């Protein structure tokens, strides 16, 4: 949200359902003093309360945590103004077929992970839920270079979630995650 301030938007509204993250942002913004940045204790499930409201929605690291990802994409589409843009970041599994993994309980030790699609599957989800001009603009394997332990983050991290013998697999034996970015538009 702070990076968006550079573009001088009229309003940036962050949905943050976790109270510790909500207050962390509030404290940081009290120092930054950026009046156009706001957050509310809301989640993506509250988007139906905002019909035709947003010019841009950033959905970052959320879609695979939703038990009904297609409903979530439809709710976002309804919350976008005509011509509005969705910027979506997600974990995916590698592959050229339009399929999604439905893990038994956890994926890379993360509970609450429902569906991990391939890039073609995610593209189809976007198209079939009504988005236009769907474009994938980045895809790469995840690695410990982007998610790792540090003196500030001492808990388990990426290297603990991946099979020690075969880095192409998660600890559960599923394909290891990749990261993908899509841009899509409401007609």
Describe each model-derived feature in a short phrase:
Residues 1-9:
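Conserved SAM-binding loop of SAM-dependent methyltransferases across substrates and taxa
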Residues 91-113:
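Short, glycine-/aromatic-enriched active-site segment of Class I SAM-dependent methyltransferases
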Residues 113-136:
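Short alpha-helix
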Residues 138-187:
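A C-terminal cap/extension of S-adenosyl-L-methionine-dependent methyltransferases
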Residues 45-57:
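A short acidic, Gly/Pro-enriched loop at the edge of an enzyme's catalytic core
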Residues 70-85, 92:
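A short glycine-rich, Lys/Arg-flanked "PGG" loop and its adjoining helix->strand segment in the class I
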Residues 32-46:
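Conserved SAM-binding strand-loop segment of SAM-dependent methyltransferases
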Residues 55-69:
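A short SAM/SAH-binding and catalytic strip from SAM-dependent methyltransferases
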